[in-house]
């Protein structure tokens, strides 16, 4: 039986706008039955979200989004792991430490571009959670360096030059292994972002399947109908589960993305 679900969302525990409980309340208002909280490199908001889900009648799945080393746009979602997740926590601790070190170099990078903002203000924007690009973008907007969050990314935070500010990332195989070690399922997120021709994406999907990938995010707000059809074909070809997610961060962070939801069959997620 299918349920209306959104399996890719972010809260203020990483770079989203809403506290986990507030995110779940919005999901209930949007008519969602199942929500996965997939913050970047952290599960710190999960238990708050689960408690809110019981209050609002939304089933909340534990989740996480991990960036893989092979490509800056290769992201792996971990879904449906249990209340104990030592392998993922160990990996995420390493990833967060690398993010924490990189924030100093981001400030230096922006200063070289004439953007002078304080790290203290960025950390306040982050609310003590994982510091990520949207936090820098919000501060830049506040001080008038950009006219919109989109401009902050286009001019500064999503350029090839910015991407040379390195941080540690695990390989896709390591991400999948950590997710499996804690009883979860590994899903390729927003494949369109990889920007690969179909043949290359087919080869990458085959390699990821060989590493244990369980599913592919076929449904995503920025996928075209043609892309969605191709991803569904990849799922059939490689016996991958089909998921869908909005990648919702909040109206202030990604104004064009709302909590959506797709009719999905989720019996394969063991911790439902």
Where are the regions a protein language model picked out?
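Short active-site oxyanion
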Residues: 33-35
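Conserved phosphoryl-transfer catalytic core
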Residues: 97-124
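Flexible, glycine/proline-enriched loop segments at strand-loop-helix junctions
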Residues: 89-98, 123-126, 162-163
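Conserved acidic, metal-coordinating active-site core of Asp-based
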Residues: 126-193
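Short, amphipathic alpha-helical segments
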Residues: 82, 93-104, 130
